[in-house]
Amino acid sequence: MKILVISSNLIGDTILSTGVINYFTNKYPETKFTFVIGPSAKSIFKNFKSVETIISVSKKRYNMHWLDIISNCYGKKWDIIIDFRSSLLSYFLKHKQKFIFKKKSNLNHVQQLSNYFKFDCSDLFIETNTEEEEIVTKHLSDDFKYFVIFPGGNWKPKIWSIKNYNSLLIKILSQNKNIKFILVGSKSEEENYLNEITKNIDSNKIINLFGASLTQTAAYMKKSKLFIGNDSGLSHMASATKLKSIVLFGPTNDVIYGPFMQDSQVIRTNESYDYFKSINIDKTKSYMDSISVEKIYFTLQKNNYCE
């Protein structure tokens, strides 16, 4: 069986769709998948054993990238086409069955998928390889608990202050000597945040994973205790690796993109998402100031995340 998946360009949405892929993999174990996907998200499937082809497509002017996609997929007989981008591509290709998913508002994204496909889409996954797992084993110790920290993001308004992250880490360490922090994100986020988030913190308490691949990051998450970070693709990766999480929300929609995993928590600003929709957002400033360090630390204690 051959399945064509037209995936999102976004890392987060791609990760949230893996429950669908998981279902079809289990139902049809011999299936070979072809993924049409953006360059930033393509590595999510690099270790996926059922992948046949990954077609990486970058956006072009006047939507000319769709011609590239058609040329790569045309002339083949697809058993199933799964389109997460609500495109017209399937109408140009031979297929036996198709699913064209369109996002809606005011319902968790994974629940939207489950409602559309009429099966449980919550079993997310991201596969890691032996080399990635051996690196984790080499660097992590059973003597410590590891918190994954993501202080960055692709949109300034939803990024909590790096000074607050630093204060939170210091507060956690003051009461918990057996915790270490794994800092994740891109190389540019390393340049922007590393020095300030680690200020006055013993370097032995920090594992700098900025710039690591998505799958290497996932391998570390699989061996960690907790994720704390801004609304992002990496917060969804925490769900895919079954890592409990505390995700911070302000001018983004926690109803749709909040973690659905049991024992994970949403902490949002005093202002609701509807409030942020009603104002003009200044893209150069953060709107997360009403979330206090104390509020997050209280959530840690209340849910026994440090134990």
Q: Where on the chain are the PLM-derived regions?
A:
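Catalytic machinery of carbohydrate-active enzymes
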Residues: 1-307
